[in-house]
Swiss-Prot record:
Binding-site residues for substrate, renumbered to this chain: Y16, G41, K105, Y129, N179, R368
Organism: Maridesulfovibrio salexigens (strain ATCC 14822 / DSM 2638 / NCIMB 8403 / VKM B-1763) (Desulfovibrio salexigens)
Keyword field contains Cell membrane: no
Presence of the UniProt keyword Transferase in the record: yes
HAMAP family: DapL_aminotrans_1 (MF_01642)
The protein's name: LL-diaminopimelate aminotransferase
One Pfam family here: Aminotran_1_2
InterPro entries linked to this entry: Aminotransferase_I/II_large, DAP-NH2Trfase_DapL_Desulfo, DapL/ALD1, LL-DAP_aminotransferase, PyrdxlP-dep_Trfase, PyrdxlP-dep_Trfase_major, PyrdxlP-dep_Trfase_small
Length: 388
């Protein structure tokens, strides 16, 4: 039988973080251990019934079983534009500044292909969602990490980047509310970033998937597009996944600079055929009618966050109280690397958390807890951690 060698771009990839966690989890579960998984950020709360009913109704329309538009239904894109206006007071032209995505991950993965040439520099604020550097590498880009440090509230020090690097940079990936640190961006930071990007002709790719999971009405996460001049240089990726508990539906959007949106759309029309239209129609209903349900989800996540923070404090594990996202970013106990602690925790207690170094070297010394199980299970998980 012939053997086929993987392309170099695959051979150099590290194991995908969450796939590796699933593998280890399966090994321990096979031994009969009760697993509490706080690893992957996949909401356990159900999609609201009214969204499911909208999908059911739309799926009965024969028109929705034909090929969809590559860029998405105009009605869906208009619903996105209306939602951005209501939520962030950002004006978007639905015909030019919005494109639908098969989940934001798909759009992020394809975006560098539209703008990165071999050898171009891509800056990634890290710890980071692994897709940013992988997608940039697939496009031939040279990736450099910009560390996010706790003493700077996990915001990049833009002045520490030399003018030479700014001039070489094609794309700068940022993510707020941040996965995994849960940090949020300030208007001052975004203003500084936009000014740097405009000065050096850099594209800002902002991942904003967690803006709707927040815990204080006075601390709502912001969109980079609220920043004056941001639309000149920025594209923002968003998703219905975390907001409405629709991770499996694969429905997202990219918005912002028209030429950046068009470039991404050009890639998409050559590699995919858009989102099932019934899902888009359900997405319209979610965007228009979902806020009362999202408010209830926030209350649940806040209760879970507070439960975890209180329990970690009792066992002297340090963490910053997050204002947003579905994660708690905690310091690894003294004497362990991130991977050592996570592996020991899983093997000896059955609790799955994510090692900080899985999000890049800047994540070493931390681990991430996902608030995706009920409060009783969270308490049980922290109780097991305390006995380690």
């Amino acid at each position: 039988m012939p053997e086929f060698k993987l392309a170099d771009r695959l051979a150099t990839l590290p194991p995908y973080l969450f796939a590796e966690i699933d593998r280890l989890k399966a090994e321990v579960a096979a031994q009969g251990v009760d697993i509490i998984s706080l690893g992957i950020g996949d909401p356990d709360l159900p999609t609201p019934d009214f969204i499911i009913e909208a999908l059911h109704k739309a799926a009965k329309n024969p028109v929705n079983h034909q090929y969809p538009s590559y860029v998405g239904l105009l009605t869906f894109r208009q619903a996105v534009a209306d939602w951005y206006k209501e939520r962030f007071d950002v004006e978007l032209d639905a015909t030019k500044e919005v494109v639908s995505l098969i989940g934001s991950k798909e759009g992020i993965a394809h975006f560098p292909l539209a703008f990165v040439n071999p050898g171009d520099l891509v800056l990634v604020a890290s710890p980071n969602y692994p897709v940013y550097p992988v997608a940039s590498g697939f496009a031939g880009g040279e990736v450099e990490i910009v560390p996010l440090l706790e003493e700077n509230d996990f915001l990049p020090n833009l002045d520490a980047i030399s003018d030479e690097k700014w001039d070489k940079c094609k794309i700068f990936f940022v993510n707020y509310p941040n996965n995994p640190t849960s940090a949020t961006a300030t208007p001052e930071f975004y203003a500084e970033l936009v000014a740097k990007a405009k000065k050096h002709n850099v594209i800002i790719a902002a991942d904003a998937a967690y803006t709707e999971v927040y815990y204080d009405e006075d601390k709502k996460p912001i969109s980079i597009l609220e920043t004056p001049g941001a639309k000149d240089v920025a594209i923002e990726f968003h998703s219905l996944s975390k907001t409405y508990n629709m991770t499996g539906w694969r429905c997202g959007m990219a918005v912002g600079n028209a030429s950046l949106v068009a470039g991404l759309g050009k890639i998409k029309e050559n590699v995919d055929s858009g989102i099932f239209q019934a899902v888009q129609e359900a997405g319209i209903v979610a965007l228009k009618e979902g806020e009362p349900y999202v408010k209830e989800f926030r209350k649940i996540y806040k209760e879970r966050r507070d439960c975890v923070i209180e329990a970690l404090e009792k066992i002297n594990i340090s963490c910053k109280v997050p204002d947003a996202s579905i994660f708690v970013w905690a310091k690894t106990p003294e004497g362990y690397t991130s991977s050592e602690f996570v592996s020991k925790l899983l093997k000896e207690t059955g609790v799955v958390v994510t090692p900080g170094n899985g999000f890049g070297e800047s994540g070493e010394g931390y681990f991430r807890i996902s608030l995706t199980v009920d409060t009783d299970r969270l308490k049980e998980a922290v109780s097991r951690i305390s006995k380690l």
